[in-house]
């Protein structure tokens, strides 16, 4: 079963339910509502094994673990190498050391996320890396849209960034990079969220005819195949799952040179200086103007994506869960 604090049902919940997974939705408008503590407790006491993701659910579940009389196993996952709470160590470090002590095991989505958490909260003995994974064949075997189907000419270059619009992601730098490139370069944004600030930058750079907002989509494999280059610009990152999806589609990727995502594209994709639109634009142009280099990077990216198969992720979690249930720790 999956319990989501957000009371609003979305397409992902529908997909889970079609796969036979029971999805329970919260009852409050804000996921931070303290009453969620009681809502969660009502459900958690029905289960023997609880796996929490993200703030504030991690806090709520940690508190509930202290209230449970019956022995249960609690696991959480660290999804990022940084968050805003770490800007105030005098306040949050003592709190989070206590929070993470409530968990029997902590998985991190990358080595960078694990190192950052261990340094922050002293979790080294109970943490381990379990990389995210994707259903590779869905992307490898996808049939991409034609350039005409996505509104482009055959000679146009499609650059795609798949990322929700929120503070972690840097959607402005790719816009500025596209503005530095010739007219044939187009940028496609796939993801939900507030696009107002990004649209303002698009207007400021006068590239409204070359930047396309597609919103949340269920056809990402086809869009990935239709693109020429994948980009992920972030201020901080734990993993960068969308980058693996683009690589699995056989497309080269260019990502911010930061912890987490650097680890994912290691030895395959290209890195650009974080926030440097000129560096990003130069790398986009270089790939498209040097076909042999493009093919080499694309091939490396597709090969690298094979390291992030969802089957491997499932196997590693199954091993972890089994060890915890049998009292063998995180081994």
Report the location of each language-model feature.
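Conserved acidic donor-binding segment of nucleotide-sugar-dependent glycosyltransferases
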Residues: 255, 270-277, 286-291
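Short His-centered aromatic/hydrophobic patch
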Residues: 52-60, 78
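N-terminal strand-loop element at the rim of the active site
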Residues: 1-31, 129, 193-195
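Aromatic "clamp/platform" in nucleotide-sugar-dependent glycosyltransferases that forms part
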Residues: 216, 235
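Short hydrophobic beta-strand element within catalytic cores of glycosyltransferases
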Residues: 3, 252-255
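Acidic anion/phosphate-binding donor-loop and adjacent secondary structure
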Residues: 31, 35, 115-119, 126, ...
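A conserved mid-protein helix/loop that constitutes part of the nucleotide-sugar donor-binding site
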Residues: 157-180, 196-197, 278
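Short, structured helix-loop element that forms part of the nucleotide-activated donor/catalytic region
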Residues: 9-17, 118, 186-209, 293
